[in-house]
Amino acid sequence: MIIHCAAQPSHDYAKNFPILDFNINATGSLNLLELTKRYCPKAPFIFMSTNKVYGDNPNKLKISEKKNRWELNKNDKYFKGINEKFSIDDCTHSFFGVSKTYADLIVQEYGRNIGLKTVCFRGGCLTGPNHSGTKLHGFLSYLVKISLSKKKYSLIGYKGKQVRDNLHSYDLVNAFWEFFKNPTKGEVYNMGGGRYSNCSIIEALDLVENISNIKIKREVIKKPRVGDHIWYISDLSKFKKHYPNWKQKYNTKKIIEELVDDFEVK
């Protein structure tokens, strides 16, 4: 089995160094597929893609402002999350999103055209106790680190009410395992916390404060990052239908509790 998680993950870095970003995310993925085809064509090939393949299209949804988050109406067709049929066209992806979209599509093509047992998991915010989050990526891990270090946390754009779904590495690896036991060719799954595990940045900060008993300094920066999602929750229905034995163990509160405990131990 090949599990391809290697990437250049920073939007800002990709904008400043687009050729290097493309070489890493796109060409690097193509090289791995060619090597798999040549030396181990029967091995399942798992690619960790990203929800950024959808660009900023989720921002075109009818999103309402609530007290601490942006949210969809419960009657909205996407209330339970973005599914795999959501458009990846006619939108701003960011340079990072473009290189990852190429990788996503070429992984699908090697499955459907060449016959490799490939799958793309389009991830939301993925994390766990050993995640070394930074300002440019690793949302929850970085938030916990800055908060418990008693530094000021910057909420960039959308009043800090933008929503993300959060998936623990334990649950993600179990999804990989389910696919490994029964692989298909050229499949795509949205993979995140879904409605079971999601929060806004404000809600995440409030959770950290309640868990750690530390008051967090905050500043709001009005200008959002290019292509940033106002609201994104993954619809996990397709994967759960294909792999009904997969169950989530960690919700956002449990994830943050583990991140706080890990930081305090370190």
Q: Language-model segments: what does each one mean?
A:
Residues 101, 114-117, 127-142, 151, ...:
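Glycine/proline-rich active-site loop of Rossmann-fold NAD(P)-dependent oxidoreductases
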Residues 69-86, 143-157, 182, 210-221:
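A short C-terminal helix-loop "cap" of Rossmann-like NAD(P)-dependent dehydrogenase/epimerase domains
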Residues 1-124:
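N-terminal Rossmann-like NAD(P)+-binding domain of SDR-like oxidoreductases, especially those catalyzing
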Residues 158-159, 188-189, 202-205, 213-231:
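C-terminal "lid/loop" region of Rossmann-like NAD(P)-dependent oxidoreductases
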Residues 169, 188, 224-247, 251:
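Conserved C-terminal active-site "lid" loop/helix of NAD(P)H-dependent oxidoreductases
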Residues 237-238, 250-266:
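Amphipathic terminal alpha-helices
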Residues 31-34, 166, 171-174, 178:
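Conserved mid-core alpha-helix of short-chain dehydrogenase/reductase
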Residues 169-172, 176, 191, 201-204, ...:
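Non-catalytic, hydrophobic alpha-helical segments
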